[in-house]
């Protein structure tokens, strides 16, 4: 099963992107794309590890930290959660990027191109469709249009998962 990374840092799409990613068992970036998020994966993994360490410290009953230090750790954790919260479970770079507004997320597009990761993108009239492997011409600003596209994409992902899990497995051998 391919792993998708849904990317949209527009406020109006943040919740939609998070919901579809969680519903389909994939990942998302809905706050800010950090430069090098996939091209410099080892550094990002270290940041995820730091986030997990902060959570362990804050959840621990035995603490050797002062209230001030715990407050600082809490602030750092919140900041890291905003940017990395949707990729904490990601173990390696994704198989496919699904990008809403390829103009705004141009750094994500360039990183995916550099690594040869296929891109599915909602491409508005102000975007270059030549940069995207699978462009979807649509309004990338409207919440309803993005919701419609993602709902249909979710159905496709769900039906693909159901087909792979059901049956006697002979379909895959053809």
Task: Give residue spans per PLM region.
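Long, charge-dense
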Residues: 20-73
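Intrinsically disordered, compositionally biased charged tails
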Residues: 155-174
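Nucleotide-binding motor/catalytic cores of P-loop/tubulin-like NTPases across gene-expression machines
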Residues: 104-136
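Membrane topogenic/interface segments and analogous intrinsically disordered interaction regions
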Residues: 1-3, 7-9, 15, 89-93
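Structured adenosyl-cofactor binding patch, chiefly the S-adenosyl-L-methionine
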Residues: 129-161
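Residue-level signature of catalytic and energy-coupling elements of molecular machines
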Residues: 6, 97, 149
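Phosphate-interacting basic helix/loop segments used at nucleotide- and nucleic-acid interfaces
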Residues: 79-84
